[in-house]
Swiss-Prot record:
Keyword entries, A-Z: Cytoplasm, Hydrolase, Magnesium, Manganese, Metal-binding, Nucleotide metabolism, Nucleotide-binding
Enzyme class, first EC level, given as a word: hydrolase
Entry keyword annotation includes Chaperone: no
Organism, as annotated: Drosophila melanogaster
GO cellular component entries: cytoplasm
One BP annotation, GO: deoxyribonucleoside triphosphate catabolic process
Summary of subunit composition and partner proteins: Homodimer.
Record's protein name: Inosine triphosphate pyrophosphatase
Assigned protein family: Belongs to the HAM1 NTPase family.
Binding of Mg(2+), residues: E39
Amino acid sequence: MSKPITFVTGNAKKLEELVAILGPSFPRTIVSKKIDLPELQGDIDEIAIKKCKEAARQVNGPVLVEDTSLCFNALEGLPGPYIKWFLEKLQPEGLHRLLHGWENKSAQAICTFGYCDGVDAEPLIFKGITEGVIVEPRGPRDFGWDPVFQPSGYDKTYAELPKSEKNTISHRYRALALLRQHFEKQDKLIN
């Protein structure tokens, strides 16, 4: 039997979405643990790999880490992986105002999961991207920048969409679909 995978997060909403998206049929047991990992700088993949290695070292077993980016095309990818700090200082209204002088309001929501089987294993990266636009904040404000991100093809922001619908189109869903495929493929090789 496989060891449980420790999802390293202190964000209850991320854990809630992960559990809802993976569902009961996911072939591994997921437990969560809050660990203070260093806040890293770099590109999206570098950050996920470094976080994953440090988490595996601290947990001494299989870990899953997640890093989310919101990349404004007019700002050449900013705030990107630094969205947490931009949101903390600017709130959703400020994120929207960042693009005030730009015609291009397009953005990418990017979720990067890093999985590491243990201390000596190399991390695997699973990345999901959802295209959209930045709009004036709409909807509940209970999950980060969801009120300002409107996915392409929708007239509602992430915050306005029912969770069940958001969880079938989001950047997190897309990354977790790749993670699920990895473990299902691995299980077929074992069985």
